[in-house]
Amino acid sequence: MTRIAVCLLFAALAGCKDQRSEPAPPARYEAVKAPAASASRWCDNSFVGAAPRLTLPPLAAPAAGRGQASLPAGKRVWLNLWATWCQPCLREMPLLLKWQTDLRKDGVEVEVLLLSLDEDGPVLEKFLAEHKEFASAKIGRAASQRDYEQWVSSYVKDPGTPIPLHLLASADGNLRCVRGGSLREGDYPAAKAALR
């Protein structure tokens, strides 16, 4: 019996832990902060301070019923270089036009201009007639491939840089960002930062 009592006593003592309470977990766990949207990482070329002035290349006559695209004075500009034969360009255009609205809602007034590199004016006109979603978009067309290449070489090292190509300018008309390649939904914060 004594043996049983001793075993029970040891079992009871072993089950008793130090009654000191463990520190409570922190009320708020530290989270890893997401990196801030970085225009300099998003842009292939970004400019701070002295920057080239954004201009348009010589433009072909506008499509029927459209005014000539021009750079608005005193407004931020997003110039998108595209073509009707460029599938990545066509996929990103609805997103770009949506972002124009979103940017305005976020207090970033920007004018989006679509500069077509289609050499055949009737092809562009047919495309615009079939795609009513671009009815309100400001669209211009480069007058010639040679004019375009001379003009774009002011902003990119290789005039053969593939499209889509995006040139973002501040309200003073100076280039802030050059970005090659398609837009993705997750690019919005960096694009917004590039326009600020």
Where are these regions (language model features)?
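N-terminal targeting signals for export/organelle localization
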Residues: 2-59, 177, 196
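Thiol-based oxidoreductase modules, predominantly thioredoxin-like and allied folds used
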Residues: 108-123, 135-146
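Thiol-/selenol-based redox modules, centered on thioredoxin-like
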Residues: 161-196
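A short beta-strand-turn-helix
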Residues: 46-77, 101-102
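Short, internal strand/loop/helix patches
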Residues: 128-163
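Conserved redox-active cysteine motifs that mediate thiol-disulfide chemistry
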Residues: 81-98
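Short pre-active-site segment immediately N-terminal to redox-active cysteine/selenocysteine motifs
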Residues: 75-77, 82-85, 162
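Solvent-exposed loop/turn segments at secondary-structure junctions
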Residues: 83-88, 117-122, 144-146, 174, ...
